[in-house]
């Protein structure tokens, strides 16, 4: 069975509590359960990881190449300034789909730019938790094309 990785970055452990007007009331635990179930219906295994620490995210991206077929990544605020995470993504050969719960292009100006998107296979923004499912569908299609 193919294995995929879902990586959530800083503050996403606070989903359901933090800025519910932006991110909704759903929790990270609920999101992870829903995503694992959706992946299972597609015949793949999804493992989930969340960290508030840039180095931990870089480490798991590096390790992912030998374990997983692809990554769904919400880098959180690291999206806008982490060239280290960008370089980690660029250093691996498996596809990465960037996802954001909110539409980063409609928010504060500092959130409009993603330094990580250019090295990802694609970016999905603004569809709430459903965006993660869209990312899963897109990643599966990318893997079929390979």
UniProtKB/Swiss-Prot annotation:
GO biological process, one term: aromatic amino acid family biosynthetic process
Pathway: Metabolic intermediate biosynthesis; chorismate biosynthesis; chorismate from D-erythrose 4-phosphate and phosphoenolpyruvate: step 3/7
EC assignment: 4.2.1.10
Enzyme class: lyase
Coiled coil regions in record: none
Pfam families to which the protein is assigned, alphabetical: DHquinase_II (PF01220)
Binding site for substrate: 74, 80, 87, 101-102, 111
Subunit organization: Homododecamer.
Family: Belongs to the type-II 3-dehydroquinase family.
The protein's name in its UniProt record: 3-dehydroquinate dehydratase
Native source species: Bacillus cereus (strain B4264)
Lineage: Bacteria, Bacillati, Bacillota, Bacilli, Bacillales
């Amino acid at each position: 069975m193919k294995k995929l990785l879902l990586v959530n970055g800083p503050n996403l452990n606070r989903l359901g509590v933090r800025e519910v007007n932006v991110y909704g009331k759903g929790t990270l635990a609920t999101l992870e359960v829903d995503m694992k179930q959706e992946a299972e219906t597609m015949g793949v295994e999804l493992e989930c990881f969340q960290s508030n620490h840039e180095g931990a995210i870089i480490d798991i991206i590096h390790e992912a190449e030998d374990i997983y077929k692809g990554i769904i990544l919400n880098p959180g605020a690291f999206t806008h300034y982490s060239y280290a995470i960008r370089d980690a993504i660029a250093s691996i050969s498996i596809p990465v789909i960037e996802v954001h719960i909110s539409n980063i292009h409609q928010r504060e100006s500092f959130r409009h730019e993603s330094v990580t998107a250019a090295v990802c296979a694609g970016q999905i923004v603004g569809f709430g938790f459903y965006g993660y499912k869209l990312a899963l569908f897109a990643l599966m299609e990318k893997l079929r094309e390979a």
